A protein has these predicted regions:
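Terminal, low-structured helical/coil segments at or just beyond the last alpha-helical repeat
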Residues: 8-18, 22, 188-241
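Solenoid-like repeat scaffolds
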Residues: 20-25, 55-62, 89-96, 124-133, ...
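Alpha-helical segment of the N-proximal tetratricopeptide repeat
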Residues: 24-66, 70-73, 77
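Register position in tetratricopeptide repeats
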Residues: 43-44, 77-78, 111-112, 145, ...
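TPR-repeat structural position
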Residues: 47, 81, 115, 153, ...
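Canonical tetratricopeptide repeat
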Residues: 69-70, 104, 140-143, 175
Length: 241
């Protein structure tokens, strides 16, 4: 039958996209071009310029969740966690199903040492990332650190041996390093970390894992402080001219 051959209708665009598409074409084009430049400024670590650019963009159109996600990422960079949380929360209200925004919000709670909220948020992210071999171990590792910080021993014990030394993730060596560090054996902890770096060095995973340890105060930072390296979410605007 003909009906069986028809393509199913596409799900409706989010409300903010529909609203954006109702703007004059010249405004949309200008906004998209300026937003891309703001993303480039962020990637180049020109954080204050990026923040200024976002203020100007907000005057053109204030409903883009990507704007608040990017602004939140800027505030994480300059360690204004309160402002970061405020912007990530605004982004999430505008785009509740965006996983990058959800992760950034969880990360902001983590950086703020609000381990109870961070643990809840990272746990909620596990199902949507279950098929992602890179993200799942990182989420579980952050849950492990939260559990240790909250003195949730049953959960920490459960997560300790989630991965082994042969798995394609630094998880095992980094959890072992934390066990040694928190037990006062710094030399043994350094050995575990060196194993992780020797095996997984040069990968983005080792950077993410050691950053997580630094943010929690388990590892000292060589720069005094570290910042998350997550990229802001794509906005959906880049395909809509």
């Amino acid at each position: 039958p003909a009906s069986a051959q028809q393509t199913p209708p596409e799900p409706p665009s989010p409300a903010w996209i529909q609203e954006f598409n109702s703007l004059p074409e010249a405004t949309r084009k200008s906004y998209i071009d300026q937003f891309r430049k703001a993303e480039q400024l962020f990637a180049q670590k020109r954080t204050m310029e990026c923040l200024f650019s976002l203020t100007e963009l907000e005057k053109l159109y204030a409903g883009n969740p990507g704007l608040y996600n990017l602004r939140g990422a800027c505030y994480i960079e300059i360690r204004n966690i309160e402002k970061a949380l405020e912007n990530f929360e605004k982004a999430q209200k505008l785009d509740p199903s965006n996983l990058t925004i959800q992760f950034n919000l969880a990360e902001a709670h983590y950086v703020n040492h609000d381990y109870a909220r961070a643990l809840k948020a990272f746990t909620e992210l596990l199902p949507p990332f279950k098929d992602n071999p890179g993200m799942t171990p990182l989420l579980q590792f952050k849950r492990y650190i939260c559990a240790r910080k909250l003195d949730n021993r049953p959960l920490a014990k459960e997560l300790e041996n989630l991965y082994g030394p042969m798995d394609d993730t630094p998880y095992y060596y980094c959890t072992q390093a934390i066990i040694k560090f928190m037990g006062g054996d710094k030399d043994a902890a350094q050995e575990q970390l060196l194993s992780a770096i020797r095996i997984h060095g040069g990968t983005s995973a080792i950077q993410a894992f050691t950053d997580a340890m630094t943010e929690a105060g388990i590892l000292p930072s060589p720069y005094g402080q570290t910042v998350p390296t997550e990229q802001p979410a794509k906005t959906g605007l880049e395909k809509r001219r």
